[in-house]
Amino acid sequence: MDHNTDPPPTTMVDAAAALLLEPKLEGYDDDGGGEPLQPAPFVSPLDQLMQPPRPLEALLQGPQLPPFLSKTYDLVCEPELDGVISWGHAGNSFVVWDPSAFARDVLPHHFKHNNFSSFVRQLNTYGFRKVHADRWEFAHEDFLRHSKHLLKKIVRRRSSPTQQSGLQPGSSGESGLDPELNTLRREKSALLQEVTRLKQEHLQTIEQMSTLNQRLESAEDRQKQMVSFLAKLLQNPTFLRQLKMHRQQKEIDSTRVKRKFLKHVPHGNIDSGESSSQHTGESNLDFSPTSLDLPATHSDILDLQNFLLEDGDLNLAMLPENIGLDGIEAPDDIGALVQGFDTQEELELGSGVELLEIPPASGPRGQDPTIGRSKGKNVLSPGLDATSSEADCLGSFSDNMGMLSDSMLQTAGKLMDADDDERIWGVDASSALQSSCSGTSQQAYGSLVSDPYLMEMANKPEKFWELDFQALDDGDLQLDKCVIDDPALQQQRGNMNS
């Protein structure tokens, strides 16, 4: 007889009940030997209870999935929510297309909050990363389409004990960073203050540069005006001679006492003009009216050069490399004016010294009725009649004189005073100006040294360039009258001299 045993019970209670109710059976062999079969070994219920339990099917799947991952996976796979959240094109990421609708309609039904930022932070704790800068697209290497079983590999990140201790308030790590942060803050504040100071200095430097540029432009304008005026004087020597004659007839009382340097001249030379001429071997200057009718010659330009060269104060300022002017046109003789600068240092005179004047050149000495002896500035022959030609002659000159400052006029007067002093007191400048002056001019200048009338004029302080247009009335001031090219005036002077 075959003996079939039942399958093992599934539970301990069923196993214990089966053991108690199952009858004890004895079997015999099939061959009829009558020998009974060996009974089955007895297993007590306690032994069955001691057997290890068998796990259920759910336990075979490993650890359970976190609810957050399973819910998120279900939301991404749900077709109804494709307009709000769905898989990416490659299936290895998901995209939240409408964060506001996702937070308003989806999160409250599946999570305990409706904050989209909290949802993103929780994704970061599980290792998700944002893969697109312009949209909310997240990806994880184990979060794939049709691969839900890979979710068990996604583990929540846990902070290490060292990090937790470092994040605890009042920890030693935070206390060690505080001094460094304070030091950095102080350094930053100092750097900001330094930058502010440098900005202020930069602005001040810009203002100073602007002021210097304006001063340089003003100085260049004055130099251009001066050189233009001197060039025009070189081009009009006839007017220069008239200016010299007028200066010789004028007397201006000085309010201060000035020293006068007189060269000792023997009485014999003072009394006799002929002996002085023989001693110097030079002829006297001709200031007759006929000489005014002659055209401008090279010697006339040299006379002006002598006037301009005899003041040492302007020697350095008038050098070509110091002036730096390219637009001024002047005659070729102005080059000779520059050559004599270095040799004129011995002729420099103090600004507080008043020099003697050249006496009148035409008619009786100091008795010319046609030339007044008025005080003021720019008084040109106030006793003469005005003509249209005279007004034309002085038109351009008055315009140029208006452009010059008072200091420039005084400088021009010093130049002319220094020239007369050389010729009166016999200062030998012929060696310095030998390359630019002709022999006739040198002889003419030398003859003035022994002129007895010059010694007589020593006690008459004169200063040429103190001209005052506003000091005279309309009857005395005839600025627009010129005596250079008037034939009637020249004839009148010839009659007076004859």
UniProtKB/Swiss-Prot annotation:
Residue ranges with Polar residues bias:
160-174, 272-291
GO BP terms: namely:
cellular response to heat; regulation of transcription by RNA polymerase II
One family name in Pfam for this protein? HSF_DNA-bind
This entry's Gene Ontology molecular function terms read:
DNA-binding transcription factor activity; sequence-specific DNA binding
Question: For this protein, what post-translational modification is recorded in UniProt?
Answer: Exhibits temperature-dependent phosphorylation.
- The residue numbers the entry assigns to motif Nuclear localization signal are 258-263
- Where is this chain's protein located in or outside the cell? Cytoplasm; Nucleus
Instruction: State the GO CC annotations.
Output: cytoplasm; nucleus
Alphabetically list the UniProt keywords: Coiled coil, Cytoplasm, DNA-binding, Nucleus, Phosphoprotein, Stress response, Transcription, Transcription regulation
Q: Which family does it belong to?
A: Belongs to the HSF family. Class A subfamily.
What does the entry's domain section say? The hydrophobic-rich region (HR-A/B) corresponds to the oligomerization domain.
Q: What is this protein called?
A: Heat stress transcription factor A-3
Traced from the root, the source organism's taxonomic lineage reads: Eukaryota, Viridiplantae, Streptophyta, Embryophyta, Tracheophyta
